[in-house]
Amino acid sequence: MENNKKVLKKMVFFVLVTFLGLTISQEVFAQQDPDPSQLHRSSLVKNLQNIYFLYEGDPVTHENVKSVDQLLSHDLIYNVSGPNYDKLKTELKNQEMATLFKDKNVDIYGVEYYHLCYLCENAERSACIYGGVTNHEGNHLEIPKKIVVKVSIDGIQSLSFDIETNKKMVTAQELDYKVRKYLTDNKQLYTNGPSKYETGYIKFIPKNKESFWFDFFPEPEFTQSKYLMIYKDNETLDSNTSQIEVYLTTK
């Protein structure tokens, strides 16, 4: 009888430890939302219109292209052209990531910058991005996937809208651009002047990875190239299972 009690106690202890372990691991797995003090305030930002120019215009988009060169071990250069460039460089977080995409057929979707963009001495018409690369083969959907974006303003769920992608695995950069573009065109997130919002961020919630977020506003003294480094990790999400939320506060 005494042995049975000991066995029962061990079983109960094991179940409790397992439950607590799962609970703790889930809490660690989910990234916390930013504290208000972590977010940059738009009213403190000089030349906020430089962010507006990034997201008001069209992004860089190219499909089924291969890299032709490298400047550094962690970047890739493509012979592709747009209205203002004839070469494009993408900078990634490290050499290992660059090697994954080097000489591969890829799709590119990125927010470009020109000031402080350096490819080589003879590259007069060049553009630069961070990340924005996905494999081309086997990554396209026959029917574009709609992703619902839920927007809270001053703590109140205020609206929702859809964005679309034709990729199975899509970069956070592509989704982020489309969300900011919609909010700029329809809700004055960015203007050629002050923003009507004081703080804001976009939160990505993948199914099998920890959530993460991007601050909508830069630090007071910023450059476009430095701000766009948020995309350097080339973070990707499953378009079929990921969720997007936006949180804004007004002035």
UniProtKB/Swiss-Prot annotation:
Keyword tRNA processing applies: no
UniProt xrefs under SUPFAM superfamilies: Bacterial enterotoxins (SSF50203), Superantigen toxins, C-terminal domain (SSF54334)
Highest rank taxon of the organism: Viruses
InterPro entries the UniProt entry points to: Enterotoxin (IPR008992), Staph/Strept_toxin_CS (IPR006126), Staph_tox_OB (IPR006173), SuperAg_toxin_C (IPR016091), Superantigen_bac (IPR013307), Toxin_b-grasp_Staph/Strep (IPR006123), Toxin_bac (IPR006177)
Signal peptide: 1-30
GO biological process, one term: symbiont-mediated modulation of host virulence
Protein name: Exotoxin type A
